[in-house]
Structures are given as structure tokens and as C-alpha cells.
């Protein structure tokens, strides 16, 4: 009886952590996508400092709220998001607008893709 209760408790803890991690990761992705959309729409209207500040917000968001994400998803996918956000800040700092826009779009697309992978369906299972 003791082993059964321990197993049930462990299962419920695992289920709770997975639910929390999934919600946390989806919120992170939504925040990154919103900030990328804002930066994409206003890229030509922002000054260099505003673009850099916005890119740093994206980078800091991924870095600060990504501790659960790095455990929950494949660590390589999280590293790709973080590295792309870092490249975005460097491209903006060096006034490379074409690479900045490409990096921004890639960050947004990969984040949307990772968020879509969290929805259970036949495509994601096989």
C-alpha cells in the first residue's frame, strides 16, 4: 500500500510539473512572438537605440524565463532561440539591417514552430 501511494504521488507531481512547464513555455513563446511582431512592424521607424533595446528585451526574456523551457523542451531548441536573439542584438548594434530582419524573422518563426510542437496531434507524434 505504501508503494502504491508513493507511486501515485510521484505520478501526480510529474503531471503537475509537466503542466506547469507547458504553460510556462507557451507563455514564453507568446511573449517572444509578441515582441518580435512589434519589432518587425516598427523596425524602420525605430532608432538604432530603440531597436537594440527591444532586441535586448527579447534576449533577456528568453534568458530569464527560459530555465523551465531548457528542462522541458530539447535543450538544443532552447539554445537556438537564445543564440538567434543574441545574433539579433549584434546585427542591430552593427547596423546590419538585412541580417537583423532575417534574424528577427527566423527567431519569430522558430519560436512559433516550437510553440506549435507543444500541441498534441498526430503530426507531432509521428
Give the label of every model feature segment.
Residues 1-3:
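Positively charged n-region of N-terminal signal peptides that target proteins for export
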Residues 6-20:
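Hydrophobic membrane-insertion alpha-helices, especially the h-region
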Residues 15-16, 39, 88:
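Alpha-helical transmembrane segments of multipass membrane proteins
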Residues 17-27, 68-76:
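A ubiquitous short alpha-helical element
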Residues 25-42:
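Alpha-helical transmembrane signal-anchor/signal-peptide segments
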Residues 39, 43-51, 92-95:
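Short helix-adjacent coil turns
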Residues 51-91:
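Extracytoplasmic/periplasmic/luminal assembly and interaction segments
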Residues 76-124:
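Structured, soluble extracytoplasmic/luminal domains of envelope-associated proteins
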Amino acid at each position: 500500500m505504501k508503494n502504491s501511494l508513493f507511486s501515485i504521488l510521484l505520478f501526480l507531481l510529474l503531471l503537475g510539473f509537466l503542466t506547469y512547464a507547458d504553460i510556462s513555455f507557451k507563455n514564453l513563446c507568446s511573449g517572444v512572438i509578441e515582441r518580435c511582431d512589434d519589432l518587425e512592424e516598427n523596425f524602420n521607424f525605430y532608432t538604432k537605440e530603440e531597436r537594440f533595446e527591444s532586441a535586448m528585451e527579447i534576449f533577456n526574456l528568453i534568458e530569464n524565463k527560459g530555465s523551465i523551457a531548457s528542462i522541458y523542451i530539447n535543450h538544443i531548441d532552447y539554445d537556438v532561440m537564445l543564440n538567434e536573439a543574441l545574433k539579433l542584438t549584434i546585427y542591430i548594434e552593427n547596423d546590419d539591417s538585412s541580417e537583423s530582419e532575417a534574424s528577427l524573422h527566423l527567431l519569430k518563426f522558430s519560436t512559433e514552430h516550437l510553440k506549435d510542437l507543444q500541441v498534441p496531434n498526430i503530426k507531432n507524434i509521428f
